[in-house]
Amino acid sequence: MKAITLLSSGLDSVAALAIAAEDFDIEMAITFDYGQRAREREIEYSRKVCEYFGIEHRVIKLDWLSEITSTSLVNRDVEVPSLSFEDIGEAAPAEITDASAKAVWVPNRNGVMLNIAGSFAESRECEYLVVGFNGEEAGTFPDNSLDYVKAMDRAFFYSTQNGVKILAPLIELGKTEIVRRALEAKAPLEYSWSCYRGEEIPCGECESCVRRARAFKNAGVKDPLLERLGI
């Protein structure tokens, strides 16, 4: 079976690609440039991941999406929230992660990306779109949830002739389990980039960095990216 993967170079999308590649023929990876702060890192690292797997890499620019996005993920005049392990713990007030999610929200981003990727999948007669949606982020980002996957599958039933479906191998997993499964699948995590800020090295403070750090700590392994960068 053939698939196209959405690849941001983040921990989740790289893990999902590696897991899917065990059973599917991955035709192409698509990375989106919507003006996000980390776009240069994401594109660079996604290219390296695609070289590792020997698959085609396509970058699609969405300039209009950056124009209508005012949050910190795109707008450098708005500060990206800094969090700690305590802020993302089970005992932490939901207001903290809700505020962080709102600060990096991009209007209908996943919906836009999935529909574009769905067009490519249909045109190439691919049955599946691989995504890194996961159980941990679904709590604060509803467009990472199983309900969302089911809704998009239903939409693709009507909007694609071949009934493209979403393959979300991480949909029930937390970040720690994702790290373990990614390592089992020999995912090139040394070329996975999670930081929202997109500087030369990960900031270690944004929500994405903190969730990643906690996952590797709980998994009892060193982060291959930080090892490669000498951090």
UniProtKB/Swiss-Prot annotation:
User: Which annotated residues bind Zn(2+)?
Assistant: 195, 203, 206, 209
| Zinc in keyword set | yes
Question: Its domain of life?
Answer: Archaea
User: What SUPFAM superfamilies does the entry give?
Assistant: Adenine nucleotide alpha hydrolases-like
- Cofactor binding note of this UniProt entry: Binds 1 zinc ion per subunit.
- Cofactor or coenzyme needed: Zn(2+)
EC identifiers of the protein: 6.3.4.20
An example molecular function term from Gene Ontology annotations: ligase activity, forming carbon-nitrogen bonds
Q: Which residues bind ATP?
A: 7-17
Metabolic or biological pathway: Purine metabolism; 7-cyano-7-deazaguanine biosynthesis
User: Which keywords does this chain's UniProt record carry?
Assistant: ATP-binding, Ligase, Metal-binding, Nucleotide-binding, Zinc
The UniProt catalytic activity note for this protein reads: 7-carboxy-7-deazaguanine + NH4(+) + ATP = 7-cyano-7-deazaguanine + ADP + phosphate + H2O + H(+)
Q: Which family does it belong to?
A: Belongs to the QueC family.
- Role noted for this protein: Catalyzes the ATP-dependent conversion of 7-carboxy-7-deazaguanine (CDG) to 7-cyano-7-deazaguanine (preQ(0)).
How is this protein named in the record?
A: 7-cyano-7-deazaguanine synthase
Q: Which organism is it from?
A: Methanosarcina barkeri (strain Fusaro / DSM 804)
Q: What is the lineage of its organism?
A: Archaea, Methanobacteriati, Methanobacteriota, Stenosarchaea group, Methanomicrobia
Q: Which gene encodes it?
A: queC
